[in-house]
Amino acid sequence: MKKPVIGITGNEKTHPDDDIMMSYAAKGFVEGVKDAGGIPIILPIGDQEMACHYISMIDKLILTGGQNVDPKFYGEPKTIDSDDYHLQRDIFELALIKEAIKQKKPIFSVCRGTQLFNVAMGGTLYQDIEDHWQDCSAEYTTQRLVTEPDTVLREI
């Protein structure tokens, strides 16, 4: 049986010793895909054309966590004082989402990835989350999700 190829969105950071930019993904994503019988492929940040090629190569897409989603993508000005944005990553991953939907490839998302998917589907985000913390066990990270009535997601 052919193993599914799973694209994992990469992030970037500067190597602390020599200012070389590195592409990476958290090892847990890579190991999780392997443990589930898939072949993990880290997708480094690229352009919109590259997004089309990547989606053609993979069977499924995982949108990982990371920086804030730039509010300009959901029609708002920045209202918080933060430099934790990556414009090129937003543009690239929005192109991945668009192409994955076009090619009917499943999309899984975590944290920022879920936020970006929401924005790609026309949603908005709370920028200032200080008043939106939820009480929960430290063993689990959760966020409440409001779903629309009579939708597949509500049924799940």
Describe each PLM feature range:
Residues 1-110, 119-121, 126, 130-156:
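N-terminal beta1-alpha1 cap of cysteine-dependent amidohydrolase-like domains
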Residues 114:
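The feature captures the ABC ATPase H-loop/switch
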